[in-house]
Amino acid sequence: MRHRHGLRKLNRTSSHRLAMLRNMSNSLFQHELIKTTLPKAKELRKVVEPLITLAKKDTVANRRLAFARLRDRDMVTKLFTELGPRYATRPGGYTRILKFGFRQGDNAPMALVELVDRPEITEAPAEEAAE
């Protein structure tokens, strides 16, 4: 019986699942918006939100804990220099999951995962042709 067991296995071994969630966390911190399946998005939220809470207090111990989870020095630096201060006053709820239709091949429910309060990306102004 799997009563009260709050983990989705996602049809993967534990090492594969850990590596996948680590890679997805790094991608989310790098791009601040990713597209994935809905169950993966819900599991990703459980990994990312505690890391951002950890990054609110910049200590060597917290950086080491984050590095143990992410294994990417650049993402740990971004987490503690940009994301931690950005969400310093927000008491949780750093990610937003938006349903994004269904995948063409297997009809899997898709979702967008984004960090809330992320800066809007403005497109580069088109260079006007010289007259």
UniProtKB/Swiss-Prot annotation:
PROSITE patterns: RIBOSOMAL_L17. It comes from the Bacteria. Part of the 50S ribosomal subunit. Contacts protein L32. One of its GO terms (biological process) is translation. The gene is rplQ. The keyword Nucleus does not apply. It comes from Cupriavidus metallidurans (strain ATCC 43123 / DSM 2839 / NBRC 102507 / CH34) (Ralstonia metallidurans). Pfam families: Ribosomal_L17 (PF01196). GO terms for cellular component: cytosolic large ribosomal subunit. SUPFAM superfamilies: Prokaryotic ribosomal protein L17. Belongs to the bacterial ribosomal protein bL17 family. This is Large ribosomal subunit protein bL17. Keywords: Ribonucleoprotein, Ribosomal protein. The keyword DNA-binding does not apply. GO terms for molecular function: structural constituent of ribosome.
